[in-house]
């Protein structure tokens, strides 16, 4: 999930890190879809080596999208996932590795957050279903129109959790998908593909980071590998910085707020379930042929360049006159660590640090002021120096009281402005709004009479008569609004607002008033603030959490069992004496098994994904762990406005009690359930042209059961071990499609094998530093001393990945195409929206015309109706431009001169006009062929040139 609002804050503070993706769309010819050839150079002017997919960020929007109707069944969900991966692949076009990672069993520290999310999702889903049924009954009772309710099972997104049948089926589908692409897509032919499905323990993004860390530790690793990671979580940014790779890019879908969402009752856009009135759907198109079209556009992708973010951070964190050598890599690690205080997936954020209030900037300023006293950096390769952190936190604690007061002042000021705004709107709005056919509308609005009603007044009158005749409940004093809904003939009386402001949630802590610390501990922890021992325990747990999270980001999971046992965080002023606290963790811990994790994170409403005897433990009143599964629970808004921002007060799961209860039901598992309950590993795939393919086939021929080292020279330096896969995909064996609508692979040439990353000792420390031989990318940001050192040269900003990329130019054929397809103006032969090419146009992409003018009609034949060249010229070409008084006739066109001197060539199938044979823009205030006055030029003629001869 990451840190809420972190990406928005980051992209606003450091805008140059964002680059829009250039995406080549598939083409369609005669009804046949032509896929994108990903083997061609990347249109983004950059070549990526490795692409990593955090698959859960793909699975969720494909299975239950928010901006379009959901897939009808599981098969459609799988196809949607395949298409989404194809889009990403065609944008990034990796040349070495594709790594797909699905969330497996998470550490215990993450399970608390997963448990909260799933309980919330179940509760909100049940409430939404009840509300939907209530509104449906009300609408039908009033005679409203609703489409028949489909009898289908509601998709429970909680099934996207390791151990469920859905995730097991997804792994099978992805195996088929990879084999299909390796067989048929030229962009995949030399690619190494690794799939880490839900059976492999660990979160998806951390499995990716663990792979990168272990490969970087190998002596033959390429330090200039260009990585691209796909995911929308904000913590991916910090994980990417933690790798210290010079070439690291994140691709994510661009967030666009206020996307239209269809109503769950009538499937129409523009309102929610609570506002649904059951009105008939407006016909789209003459014959309703556009009924299935959606008003939402396909999402766009953006690149986030971490190398540019590193430049920003280097500028911001650079400090002079330090008592120790400045190291930008260490300072970036400290910045990542400070971001943990404003929130992460494992710890609640400190009450005084809100990212929307500039908490990170405040921490950085305090860090730069205090670092001279600390004597060094806060972190080193994932380990925290608590003595130095204590100095930072106590400095934050000194300003906590002023932070709370300023927050209250800002909130009060915002409420006053909103109240004044509502008063102005109420004062400016008329109390009486006319309606009906003659309703006045603003000019140019979509609902104006000229756009809808007046376009066919007879049809509107007919519909009104039919509506009145067929609806006895509608009185004669009723008219119809532009959307077809009945409204009083005289108009609509606007309802007075019930209140000037929304009710504010009750806040018993009141952090802005004296005594805030005592009230906080009493309300949140139910203890007295004077209980120093308890406060020390809370701070100790939070400090352990900070150390655990940093080590998780830089070294891997320090303990699978540790978790923060409270719902709330302490204050920064409570961090006194943390230098003496221990930050060691129990070694040798193991992750939960998949079904055990389901029991720890699922509510009873999602028990259908568990074996029968297991789910009984969730609902049986006599169950020893029934208290883990409350049917309802409180949500503490904790000073926030919306429920999703609040804290779900769920009981923590006691691991010992849970395991003891499960021991009694373990014998009830079937062989299939036992298989799904086991932990798995990664699988590597290659195609027939990959150098590693023959080596893998030899392993299957020998039947060796011992792990074999991967030859790095055959797969771009990747190291690890191979072991035979019991469910292997092998050549000359049919790969059956798990999706009925997709074909089987009868001539398979791909091969798969189990893969394991290089192993290290438990106390091994991965160095958080840039590798020797790594080359930093060219600087993107404008140097601070540019004005002094540039000798008057103008700074040229870099808009994409390549500073030397050529600007986009259109050749003469493209301009002619625009001239043909652009709507024409009225009254004269002009293209109203076509800009003239510049007279000195010399595009880098210029190419001379094909030999023989007879080829031009063939070239344009796919853009014009058939045989359009044989008929008389269109009206806009029959019009003759008026020549200036005394002007001489034009000389004939000289191809040789044109080819030598011009990037544009006259088109003999069009009239002569401006440069390149293009007519000028229409100008009603001027006459003459080039916009000159009709009485002729007022200045001497220009000298003759080889390009045009006007005489």
Curated annotation (Swiss-Prot):
Q: Which domain of life is it from?
A: Eukaryota
Q: Which residues carry this modification: Phosphothreonine?
A: 439
**Region named Disordered:** 408-508, 907-951
Chain's role? Possesses 5'->3' exoribonuclease activity. May promote the termination of transcription by RNA polymerase II. During transcription termination, cleavage at the polyadenylation site liberates a 5' fragment which is subsequently processed to form the mature mRNA and a 3' fragment which remains attached to the elongating polymerase. The processive degradation of this 3' fragment by this protein may promote termination of transcription. Binds to RNA polymerase II (RNAp II) transcription termination R-loops formed by G-rich pause sites.
**Gene Ontology terms for molecular function:** 5'-3' exonuclease activity; 5'-3' RNA exonuclease activity; identical protein binding; transcription termination site sequence-specific DNA binding; zinc ion binding
Protein's gene: Xrn2
A Gene Ontology biological process term: retina development in camera-type eye
Keywords for this protein: Acetylation, DNA-binding, Exonuclease, Hydrolase, Metal-binding, Methylation, mRNA processing, Nuclease, Nucleus, Phosphoprotein, Transcription, Transcription regulation, Transcription termination, Zinc, Zinc-finger
Q: Which GO terms describe its cellular component?
A: aggresome; nucleolus; nucleoplasm
Q: Where is the composition biased (Basic residues)?
A: 416-426
**What is the name of this protein?**
5'-3' exoribonuclease 2
Give the E.C. number(s).
Answer: 3.1.13.-
Q: Could you say which protein family the record assigns here?
A: Belongs to the 5'-3' exonuclease family. XRN2/RAT1 subfamily.
The chain residues annotated with the modification N6-acetyllysine are 286
Q: What class of enzyme is it?
A: hydrolase
Supply the Gene3D superfamilies for this chain.
Answer: 1.25.40.1050, 3.40.50.12390
Question: Where is the sequence biased in composition, kind Polar residues?
Answer: 445-458, 467-485
Q: Which residues form a coiled coil?
A: none
